[in-house]
Swiss-Prot record:
UniProt feature coiled coil, ranges: none
Signal peptide: 1-16
PANTHER family tied to this protein: CUTICLE PROTEIN, CUTICULAR PROTEIN 65EA-RELATED
Entry protein name: Larval cuticle protein LCP-22
Keyword flag Transcription regulation: no
Biological function: Component of the cuticle of the larva of Bombyx mori.
Organism of derivation: Bombyx mori
Domain Chitin-binding type R&R per the UniProt entry, residue ranges: 82-153
Length: 174
C-alpha cells in the first residue's frame, strides 16, 4: 500500500512539472502564416542568339589508326589441367600477340608454383614501321626485348678506362 501511495505521488509530481520555455523560443521561427507563392510581374524575354563572325578553319589531324573497327582474324586460347596455357590473336589492322605459360615448381613450404610466361606482341607504328616485343616473365621479373625497347648508349671510352683503372689499382675496403 505504501508503495502505491509513493508511486502515485511520483506520477503526480512528474505530471505537474511545468515545461521551461523562454520568451524567445519559437517552435518554427521560419513559418509564415500568410504564405503566398512568388509571382513574377514581368514576362520573360526570348533569348536571341547573336551571330558570330566566321573564324579561320582549324586543320583537322588525320586519324592514325582505325582501331575501333579492327576485326579479329585469328584467335586461339587453350588452358590445360596442369596449369599451362597458350593463347594468340591477330587483327586485320596489324596487331598480334601470343603467349605460352607453364607453372614452375620452385619448392618451399608451402610450395611456390609461379607461372613462367613467354610471348610476344607486335603492331605497326603511325610511321608505318612494324614494332615487335618479345618477353619472358619468370621469377626474375618481366624481361622485354625488341626494337621498341630503348637501349642505353655505350659508355664513353675515357670513362671505361677510368673504371678499369679504379678496379685494377684501388683495393676494396673490408
Amino acid at each position: 500500500m505504501k508503495f502505491a501511495v509513493v508511486f502515485a505521488c511520483m506520477v503526480a509530481a512528474v505530471a505537474a512539472q511545468v515545461r521551461y520555455e523562454n520568451e524567445f523560443y519559437k517552435k518554427n521561427p521560419y513559418r509564415y502564416s500568410t504564405y503566398r507563392p512568388f509571382v513574377s510581374v514581368t514576362t520573360p524575354t526570348p533569348f536571341l542568339p547573336i551571330p558570330i563572325s566566321s573564324v579561320a578553319p582549324v586543320r583537322v589531324v588525320p586519324k592514325v589508326s582505325e582501331g575501333y573497327g579492327a576485326e579479329t582474324v585469328k584467335f586461339g586460347n587453350e588452358i590445360n589441367p596442369d596449369g599451362s596455357y597458350t593463347y594468340f590473336y591477330e587483327t586485320n589492322n596489324g596487331i598480334a600477340a601470343q603467349e605460352q605459360g607453364v607453372p614452375r615448381n620452385l619448392g618451399g613450404n608451402p610450395p611456390a608454383v609461379p607461372v613462367v610466361a613467354q610471348g610476344s606482341f607486335s603492331w605497326t607504328s603511325p610511321e608505318g614501321v612494324p614494332i615487335s616485343v618479345n618477353y619472358v616473365a619468370d621469377e626474375n621479373g618481366y624481361q622485354p626485348t625488341g626494337n621498341a625497347i630503348p637501349t642505353s648508349p655505350p659508355v664513353p671510352e675515357q670513362i671505361a678506362r677510368a673504371l678499369a683503372y679504379i678496379a685494377k689499382n684501388i683495393p676494396l675496403k673490408k
